[in-house]
């Protein structure tokens, strides 16, 4: 595992406990076959040659268990992309490069995946952890979000306990709300609302934002509008600083 130890004796014990619980959750993720046809667990692609000791490759890039902010995406992609990139998040992904600009706007200076060492500063994960079998743009099934939400997404958020959970896109937002059985609002209203949703008992505040991939940037929400959306996250994050 790449998670650094820090702090005094009590802090070391708490960190060790977090690491142990996280690794146990990762092992359950690797063994999961709940969704069946349409999804493939990274642990079986090329006999697990490109899988990682994290909830997924996005968490391998940013997997700090004490992160103040967690980003939840929809899914990582499909089997073909995973094999082509040998299981690594790419430096050239429009989603990744734009996300780093948005995070920089609220004070987080992160590096691209191949330039990142250690477990990073934040925690990234996806609402669906397995890989699509029929192409990156293929449809996703509601039960995939339900299965992953209760088995992995909620336990991961409760383990990390970030101050803020940023939901990247409507499906990620609905997955988080569904994992807590909280009624989701209309997405635009949720994005533009001055109020966040509090997740009990961990106390994380949920902020949905539009996806920052090329298609959404070019059609639904341009970069300038997304920067404005992220400003409210920055204000909340730095209250009391």
Model regions: which residues?
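Intrinsically disordered, glycine-rich low-complexity segments
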Residues: 7-10
């Amino acid at each position: 595992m790449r998670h650094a130890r820090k702090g005094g004796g009590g802090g070391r014990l708490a960190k060790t406990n977090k690491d142990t619980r996280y690794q146990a959750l990762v092992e359950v993720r690797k063994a999961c076959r709940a969704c069946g046809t349409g999804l493939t667990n990274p642990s079986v692609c090329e006999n697990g040659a490109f899988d990682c000791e994290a909830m997924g490759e996005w968490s391998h890039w940013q997997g700090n268990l004490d992160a103040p902010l967690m980003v939840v995406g929809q899914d990582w992609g499909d089997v073909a992309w995973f094999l082509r990139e040998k299981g690594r998040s790419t430096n050239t992904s429009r989603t990744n490069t734009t996300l780093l600009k948005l995070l920089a706007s609220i004070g987080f200076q992160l590096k691209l995946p191949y330039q990142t060492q250690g477990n990073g500063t934040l925690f990234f994960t996806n609402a669906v952890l397995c890989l699509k079998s029929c192409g990156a743009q293929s449809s996703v099934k509601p039960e995939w979000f339900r299965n992953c939400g209760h088995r992995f997404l909620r336990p991961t958020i409760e383990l990390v306990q970030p101050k803020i959970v940023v939901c990247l896109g409507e499906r990620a937002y609905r997955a988080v709300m569904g994992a807590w059985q909280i009624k989701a609002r209309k997405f635009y209203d949720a994005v533009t609302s001055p109020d966040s949703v509090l997740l009990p008992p961990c106390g994380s505040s949920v902020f949905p934002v539009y996806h920052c991939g090329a298609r959404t940037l070019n059609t639904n929400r341009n970069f300038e509008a997304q920067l404005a959306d992220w400003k409210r996250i920055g204000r909340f994050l730095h209250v009391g600083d």
